[in-house]
Amino acid sequence: MLTFVGLGLYDAGDISVKGLEAVRASDAVFLEYYTSRLMGTTIEDLVRAYGKEVIVLARADVEQHPEPILDAAAAGDVVVLTGGDPMVSTTHMDLRLRAAARGIPTGIIHGASIQTAVCGLTGLQNYRFGKSCSVPFPQKNWFPLTPYEVVRQNLAADLHTLVYLDIQQDRYMRVGEAIDLLEEMAVRVGGSITTYIGVARAGSVSPVVRAGTADHLRGIDFGGPLHVLIVPATLHPVEQEYLEVFAGLSV
């Protein structure tokens, strides 16, 4: 059997009781650690906390060469650990489909996701979010405008946008960098963004949540990763009050 277990948002303590039971009862534990990471812990901490050896997967291990995972799941009970909630990533959906194609039973044990955590941290109503997008680090001769197009379409529909920030092997995009990139995108297509909300280290005991203009947020030290960004649409009075109280929004 192949069971996907969400680890939650920040550290080894975020796993559910049900998830921990599945890990400890398994024959093999794999960790997919490139679509999201827990910044409040280390792999060594996970091994100690869960009492099991953990095999760390590279992107190619999941997307191109998943046979060792599937072979192990065909022979016994295998757990694949993921940051956040497992099926938010299409990578995990594909692996589950591959398992089903081989007749391997699968299951999901959910974990806390940034998609819902931002609602509690910012007070934005969850049903008012549109399509999310990701801002990548630009490369030579490559500066995609798609993230801003998603934001613009959502704003036109009066919907908030959750913006994921790029994660690389040794580099994590920060709120200020993402704002600079979105502002450049907006200039190139003749648009603008009035308000941003930056969130850092959701799930930790000291998350940072700040709302305001691009210039205001550029001057704030959000601290260590992971960071995400929200571009809000028109605010409901309760949303606005929440942001004023808990994110320092000035009106």
Curated annotation (Swiss-Prot):
Keywords: Methyltransferase, S-adenosyl-L-methionine, Transferase. It catalyses: 2-[(3S)-amino-3-carboxypropyl]-L-histidyl-[translation elongation factor 2] + 3 S-adenosyl-L-methionine = diphthine-[translation elongation factor 2] + 3 S-adenosyl-L-homocysteine + 3 H(+). Its EC number is 2.1.1.98. S-adenosyl-L-methionine-dependent methyltransferase that catalyzes the trimethylation of the amino group of the modified target histidine residue in translation elongation factor 2 (EF-2), to form an intermediate called diphthine. The three successive methylation reactions represent the second step of diphthamide biosynthesis. It comes from the Archaea. Pfam families: TP_methylase. S-adenosyl-L-methionine binds at residues 9, 85, 88, 113-114, 165, 202, 227. InterPro entries: 4pyrrol_Mease, 4pyrrol_Methylase_sf, 4pyrrole_Mease_sub1, 4pyrrole_Mease_sub2, Dphthn_synthase. This is Diphthine synthase. NCBIfam families: dph5. Belongs to the diphthine synthase family. GO terms for biological process: methylation; protein histidyl modification to diphthamide. Gene3D superfamilies: Cobalt-precorrin-4 Transmethylase, Domain 1 (3.40.1010.10), Methyltransferase, Cobalt-precorrin-4 Transmethylase, Domain 2 (3.30.950.10). It comes from Methanosphaerula palustris (strain ATCC BAA-1556 / DSM 19958 / E1-9c). Pathway: Protein modification; peptidyl-diphthamide biosynthesis. GO terms for molecular function: diphthine synthase activity. Homodimer.
